[in-house]
Amino acid sequence: GGGLVIKILTEGYPVVEILDTMILQPQSEIGKVRRFLNEHNLQITEENMVEEDGKFYPMMKVIHGKKEEYTICEYTYGKRLLLEQHPVLKKYLDREMQIKESVFQQLFKHQNSASAAERMEELKQEIILTQEALKYYE
């Protein structure tokens, strides 16, 4: 996952420094990986995403570079994927939106509990972020 990618890059930094290019495929915490790369002047020059058997696999080409400006949405979903209006990312975003809205509706029925109300608030923020990403496709 993403945590392991960050650990490998951190512990292996002497090797990272001499590499011209890296291809990374974090399977979780992808936003954290993007943020880590940017904070360490490692620039994502290309991103791709594929889907197989209903699972989505992001990948990125990384070189030494300089820090870039990223929004939270771009860290979360991939600046290059969003700017390119990547079709597989669009499919992922549509699915995420359906899932989040469905969970929100289920929680709405049980909003009396504090934990449901708290999760609903988290979901609202996630839905807003996903909607922001979907605006790239308009």
Task: Go through each PLM region and give its residues.
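Amphipathic alpha-helical interface surfaces
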Residues: L4-V5, V33, P58, L89
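Short alpha-helical
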Residues: G3, S28-K32, I99
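Active-site capping/gating segments
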Residues: S28-K32, L37-E69
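An accessory alpha-helical subdomain
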Residues: Y70-E138
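Active-site segment flanking the S-adenosylmethionine/decSAM binding pocket
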Residues: G1-Y13
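Conserved beta-strand signature within the Rossmann-like core of class I S-adenosyl-L-methionine
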Residues: Y13-G31, Q43
